[in-house]
């Protein structure tokens, strides 16, 4: 929520340019925008740059699908989602917030509690973005989240509309139409 970051995000919003944030928790040796437990900095950013599409990504973002403590915020929490965290609350409150499921953090958040993951995908299918990331080594390991989504589609746990929104339509909806 640094004023310089807010200004940058507002400028991007004026040009209809979405911005992806790699969010982390406090600590040394990480990269991205630091945000304490509960995502208060992200919430202030969303409030102060309401015309900017903000795409959340990274461990500090996805760990907040359920309540998390500071030591686990920059990691990959496991186990059932017994209570919702800051992430679902923010998605419900701020229509300019989107969620990128690329990399292990998004995949982990959605698969740590399969029933909750499916419910999350259904509720927020209009603001979840499929992406890829360089953190997976080989081509077969690069996109486990695509196999996960395809499996949910094949089993009927998500419908074709949700699958299509997540895997492409949502992104096309937020990218600016540039005239060349």
Sequence positions of predicted segments:
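Catalytic pocket-lining loop regions of alpha/beta-barrel enzymes
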Residues: 1-130
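Mid-to-C-terminal alpha-helical segments outside catalytic/metal-binding sites
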Residues: 124-129, 135-180
């Amino acid at each position: 929520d640094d004023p310089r970051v807010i200004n940058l995000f507002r400028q991007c919003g004026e040009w209809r340019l979405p911005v992806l944030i790699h969010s982390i928790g406090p600590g040394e040796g990480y990269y991205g925008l630091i945000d304490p437990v509960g995502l208060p900095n992200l919430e202030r950013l969303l409030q102060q740059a309401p015309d900017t599409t903000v795409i959340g990504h990274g461990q500090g973002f996805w760990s907040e699908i359920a309540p998390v403590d500071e030591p686990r915020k920059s990691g990959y929490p496991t186990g059932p989602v017994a209570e919702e965290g800051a992430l679902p609350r923010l998605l419900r409150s701020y229509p300019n917030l989107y969620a990128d499921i690329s990399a292990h953090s998004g995949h982990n958040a959605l698969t740590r509690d399969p029933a909750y993951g499916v419910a999350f995908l259904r509720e927020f299918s209009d603001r979840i973005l499929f992406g890829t990331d360089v953190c997976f080594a080989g081509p077969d390991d690069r996109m486990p989240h695509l196999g996960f989504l395809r499996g949910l589609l094949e089993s009927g746990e998500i419908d074709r509309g949700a699958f299509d929104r997540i895997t492409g339509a949502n992104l096309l909806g937020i990218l600016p139409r540039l005239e060349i």
